[in-house]
């Protein structure tokens, strides 16, 4: 049975980067998100051993980003796999657990590579994708290779194509425009990050794993723009809780050309997630201090 392509949304050819942005429609959200992210980052700066203490948040980000992609697992399974793993990936391990652990490792490796002076380029993204899909179900989905046939985003239950990304024939041109935007745009960092995430998702350059790479780019780009002192910002929780709105706002860019609606949604997501991350970080820090005092 074939999928119905009637009324499917098509990629916005010729509409990237956006020609006009109306800041009056989201200036309040931009200020709130900037403030919330700054307060969260200050907490990171004041937290000793933050890489270790924020491990539970990092695990949850990998879990939720993979869940949005369709991967299902539990936190206990992830922790058990991490504890047992010796650096190699066992083919006996549960596939979805492997995918989530690989997400964590890919993000950590990306930080190390960028920290050494490497730039965010097409080759960097391909290497990130190769690490993400190294094993598990993704191993058969051409890790590190861009699509060569048209891909689709579909509602499998209704057998309906919801979105048609850019064609393979136009992909290189689309990626070149995205890389140029990343390196040359002078837009406010949060607005720029919103546009980068949307465009990568719209291009959907890989056979699989596009959403996870796209969400990694949010954290990595905010870090590169110096809005984060370290790449420890986890936004998938908000996207998971508001999945329908998340997808609708992204689709409307291609459907109606409304970048402002998407940017406003993204800023609301950053604001809400930064506040939540700050609260969780403070709880983790307080628990650490409490336990430390008990053992001194």
For the regions a protein language model found, what residue spans apply to each?
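FIC/Doc superfamily catalytic core
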Residues: 1-296
